[in-house]
Amino acid sequence: MTARKSYTYPIFTVRWLAVHALAVPTVFFLGAITAMQFIQR
């Protein structure tokens, strides 16, 4: 399991970074759009 961890670590890190890189801005834009709609009203 330790041998595979060294091989899986970089792939898992890149995948984790890509998911957060897409998820964080998405949540931020959704929050900004929701806030703008409430401000207009």
Swiss-Prot record:
Gene Ontology cellular-component terms listed: chloroplast thylakoid membrane; photosystem II reaction center
Transmembrane segments: 16-32
Localisation per UniProt entry: Plastid, Chloroplast thylakoid membrane
UniProt-listed InterPro entries: PSII_cyt_b559_bsu (IPR006241), PSII_cyt_b559_CS (IPR006216), PSII_cyt_b559_N (IPR013081)
Disulfide bond positions: none
Cofactor annotation: heme b
Keyword Plastid: yes
GO molecular function ontology, one term from the record: heme binding
Primary localization: plastid
Function: This b-type cytochrome is tightly associated with the reaction center of photosystem II (PSII). PSII is a light-driven water:plastoquinone oxidoreductase that uses light energy to abstract electrons from H(2)O, generating O(2) and a proton gradient subsequently used for ATP formation. It consists of a core antenna complex that captures photons, and an electron transfer chain that converts photonic excitation into a charge separation.
Similarity field: Belongs to the PsbE/PsbF family.
Protein name as it appears in the record: Cytochrome b559 subunit beta
